[in-house]
């Protein structure tokens, strides 16, 4: 009965626990990878800039995060594509050849 009342009045401890656990996991992943939130935000902005040369994307729906699995950290980007641009800047040849 108490659990029902807590859920009814908006104090769902199970979901609060999940949110807190996810936040802690994200903090630990960022800490282990040595990536600050500022660096991740800069990376996100650079990704938007580069990808926008080729595709129209939904920047509001774009998500960039770090995940940690088995001692490996991965950058995960979820980028909603609206359409492919038909014209884009041409890639220049490098000034020197190896």
UniProtKB/Swiss-Prot annotation:
Pfam families named among the record's database cross-references: MinE
GO biological process: cell division; regulation of division septum assembly
Keyword Iron: no
InterPro entries: MinE, MinE_sf
Keywords: Cell cycle, Cell division
UniProt key word Cell division: yes
Known function: Prevents the cell division inhibition by proteins MinC and MinD at internal division sites while permitting inhibition at polar sites. This ensures cell division at the proper site by restricting the formation of a division septum at the midpoint of the long axis of the cell.
HAMAP family hit by this protein: MinE
Similarity annotation: Belongs to the MinE family.
Name of protein: Cell division topological specificity factor
Organism: Moorella thermoacetica (strain ATCC 39073 / JCM 9320)
């Amino acid at each position: 009965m108490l659990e029902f009342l807590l859920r009814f009045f908006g104090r769902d401890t199970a979901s609060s626990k999940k949110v807190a656990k996810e936040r802690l996991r994200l903090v630990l992943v960022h800490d282990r990878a040595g990536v600050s939130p500022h660096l991740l935000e800069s990376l996100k902005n650079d990704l938007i800039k580069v990808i926008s040369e080729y595709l129209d994307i939904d920047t509001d729906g774009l998500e960039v995060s770090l995940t940690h699995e088995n001692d490996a950290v991965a950058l995960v980007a979820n980028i909603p594509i609206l359409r492919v641009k038909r014209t884009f800047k041409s890639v220049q040849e490098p000034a020197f050849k190896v």
